[in-house]
Curated annotation (Swiss-Prot):
Its EC number is 1.1.1.94. It is found in: Cytoplasm. Keywords: Cytoplasm, Lipid biosynthesis, Lipid metabolism, NAD, NADP, Nucleotide-binding, Oxidoreductase, Phospholipid biosynthesis, Phospholipid metabolism. Catalyzes the reduction of the glycolytic intermediate dihydroxyacetone phosphate (DHAP) to sn-glycerol 3-phosphate (G3P), the key precursor for phospholipid synthesis. Signal peptide: none annotated. HAMAP family: NAD_Glyc3P_dehydrog. This is Glycerol-3-phosphate dehydrogenase [NAD(P)+].
Length: 330
């Protein structure tokens, strides 16, 4: 299998390195000439993965045509608000019926489209076979070959099986499903809940509060997922509960770090300016808040996170309002 990974951040570089080490013909497209030069000369992406030697077999380029030549499988690993632009950049190099694997988690803010909807819209002329790769996975751990399990969602079962077999390793295990909508929504919404969990941790609350947020966040995820055609059972799996637990508890979680710093009184713009990588939950909170209102789905955690991020709401007041909502059955 020839595979091209689009995006030279930590996750894109990690997936490309994994594919190359597995023995696949793997190419990595990066935007910056300096990143390409560094990987070619020292086999390192020091900005995102300092100290990690990349496979000597991994090809890297800033030229879309060179990266895409002869390739049938494309992994897009760029921040979700830029995924449409990445599709548009590569559309003339993608073959008809190409397998397009999205490794970005979120909702497009301008359109409120999920990642699969953006793909089908932007790449309609080539009729891609879309797959969503999601689940509890920090690039920091995968690049170090620590055991990780993820989910690949694709309507085309053969395409899913091919990718599963091609990319699974003794340390990176891929499960498959046909529930694309459920998997992509789980990966998006968990980042919002992680911001809330970070806020709770930053305010000095304990494990009780974190457990409540994770559990009620899962309910929130399932409600919106069902309204949008996802299978509720999917949210009990790796791309739902698994990713939710990791992102709400892991010190490597960028979204949790945003919540922690907001609770300490830091301003959102200052936090984002100080981060090397994108915290997807910030824009996703705005998009999911709008989706919940549009579909009439109750999203209390999302509403409070949105208010903290965009209405300058005091985090302590947001927690108080969550805890004093009308009492109800579980």
């Amino acid at each position: 299998m020839k595979i091209a990974v689009i995006g030279g951040g930590s996750w894109g570089t990690t997936l490309a390195d994994l594919a190359a080490k597995k023995g696949l013909d793997a190419r990595l497209w990066v935007r910056e000439q300096a990143v390409m030069n560094e990987i070619r000369s020292s086999r390192e992406n020091s900005w995102y993965l300092p100290g990690r030697k990349l496979s000597d077999q991994l090809e890297v380029s800033t030229d879309p045509a060179a990266v895409a030549e002869g390739v049938s499988h494309f992994v897009f690993a760029v921040p979700c608000q830029f995924i449409r632009a990445a599709y548009q950049r590569f559309i003339k190099y993608l073959p008809k019926n190409a397998v397009v694997i999205c490794a970005s988690k979120g909702i497009e803010l301008d359109t409120l489209m999920t990642m699969s909807q953006v793909c089908q819209d932007a790449l309609a002329s080539i009729k891609p076979r879309f797959a969503m790769l999601s689940g509890p996975s920090f690039a920091y751990e995968v690049i170090r070959e620590m055991p990780t399990a993820v989910t690949l969602a694709c309507k085309d079962k053969k395409a899913a099986k091919d990718v599963q077999e091609a990319l699974s390793t003794p340390y990176f295990r891929i499960y498959t499903t046909t529930d694309v909508r459920g998997v992509e929504l789980g990966g998006a919404i968990k980042n919002i809940v992680a911001i809330a969990a970070g806020v709770a941790d930053g305010l000095g609350f304990g494990g009780d509060a974190r457990a409540a947020l994770i559990t009620r966040g899962l309910h929130e995820m399932s409600r919106l997922g069902k309204a949008m055609g996802g299978d509720r059972q999917t949210f009990m799996g790796l791309s739902g509960m698994g990713d939710l637990v990791l992102t709400c508890t892991g010190d490597l979680s960028r979204n949790r770090q945003v919540g922690l710093r907001l609770a300490k009184g830091q301003k959102l713009l200052d936090i984002l300016a100080d981060m090397k990588m994108v915290a997807e939950g910030v824009k996703t909170a705005e998009a999911v808040h709008a989706l919940g209102q549009k579909l009439g789905v109750e999203m209390p955690i999302t509403e409070q996170v949105y208010a903290i991020l965009y209405k300058d709401k005091d985090p302590s007041k947001a927690v108080y309002e969550l805890m004093t909502r009308d009492l109800k059955d579980e």
